[in-house]
Swiss-Prot record:
Broadest EC class assigned to this enzyme: transferase
Name of this chain's protein: Pyridoxal kinase PdxY
Binding, substrate: 10, 45-46, 224
Function: Pyridoxal kinase involved in the salvage pathway of pyridoxal 5'-phosphate (PLP). Catalyzes the phosphorylation of pyridoxal to PLP.
Enzyme Commission number(s) of this protein: 2.7.1.35
GO MF: ATP binding; magnesium ion binding; pyridoxal kinase activity
Residues at which ATP binds: 112, 144, 149, 182, 209-212
InterPro entries membership: PM/HMP-P_kinase-1 (IPR013749), PyrdxlKinase (IPR004625), Pyridoxal_kinase_PdxY (IPR023685), Ribokinase-like (IPR029056)
Keyword Nucleotide-binding tagged: yes
Organism this protein belongs to: Shigella sonnei (strain Ss046)
Reactions mediated catalytically: pyridoxal + ATP = pyridoxal 5'-phosphate + ADP + H(+)
Keyword presence, Nucleotide-binding: yes
């Protein structure tokens, strides 16, 4: 049975970020994606200039009311939220999550708590980080912070893999069943590898892959693709190990393809066959 995912995050007309990055790879893995855009920008913000607008929070609710009106909301298997244009959008998204779960009690809420990295040019509105700590975290079934976001959510420093597992379990105690730490960075075992953790109350899986060197300008949207693919694989019933291994390899294929084509924007279409069937393999280790 094909899974239906309501994906509520940013959209760029040119290039790949938010839904513009994740939607196609998720579909390539066999999911129906219902993209609902929190912002519509000309391009992602790391170019330093862009045009477009943040959607009014009521717009998100109105679109979902339309889906409910044609009696299709019960077919939604999960809500995915990513980049928010405002904290008020977050409150409306939680209302949407409640509405979806009322229609389908088995539906999951996957929160990608994008909180911004000013040094990278990723900017979020005031109040968004606080929204995730107070409201997004306890409402989520699955949450996918990077290291900086993990530290904000658990409200203390995380310096190594063991501390990251403990921090993930602190989050689990507040609501979610699954935590993906999308990028361990300085808390990982090795500075020259890209490492991730997938943690539940009683399991923790670690994986690493080579870093792909893009020089000064790292492509945007890698986390969005990672979250989207992870949600698809979880909904399809893969084990935690299978999920982590496939997602890591698929994202690596996109990165390698992008680098080989000497592009800055993620080359998700060019890499599509290797998203579905990666040529590389990375083994996850149970901690």
């Amino acid at each position: 049975m094909m899974k239906n995912i309501l994906a509520i995050q940013s959209h760029v007309v040119y290039g790949h970020a938010g839904n513009s990055a994740a939607e196609f790879p998720m579909r390539r893995l066999g999911a129906n994606v219902w993209p609902l855009n929190t912002v519509q920008f000309s391009n992602h913000t790391q170019y330093g200039k862009w045009t477009g607008c943040v959607m009014p929070p009521s717009h998100l609710t109105e679109i979902v009311q339309g889906i409910a009106a044609i009696d299709k909301l019960h077919t939604c298997d999960a809500v995915l939220s990513g980049y928010l244009g405002s904290a008020e959008q977050g409150e409306h998204i939680l209302g949407i999550v409640r509405q979806v779960k009322a229609a389908n009690p088995q539906a999951k809420y996957f929160c990608d708590p994008v909180m911004g990295h000013p040094e990278k040019g990723c900017i979020v509105a005031p109040g968004v980080a606080e929204f995730h700590v107070r409201h997004g975290l306890p409402a989520s079934d699955i949450i996918a912070p990077n290291l900086v976001e993990l530290e904000i959510l658990c409200e203390h420093a995380v310096n190594n893999v063991e501390e990251a597992v403990l921090a993930a379990r602190e989050l689990i105690a507040q609501g979610p069943q699954i935590v993906l730490v999308k990028h361990l960075a300085r808390a990982g075992y090795s500075r020259d590898r890209f490492e991730m953790l997938l943690v539940t109350a009683d399991e923790a899986w670690h994986i690493s892959r080579p870093l792909v060197d893009f020089g000064m300008r790292q492509p945007v949207g890698v986390g969005d693709v990672t979250s989207g693919l992870l949600l698809v694989k979880l909904l399809q019933g893969a084990t935690l190990q299978e999920v982590l291994e496939h997602v890591t390899a698929a994202v690596y294929e996109i990165m390698v393809t992008t680098k080989a084509m000497q592009e800055y924007e993620l080359q998700v279409v060019a890499a599509q066959d290797r998203i579905a069937k990666p040529e590389h393999y990375f083994s996850a280790t149970k901690l």
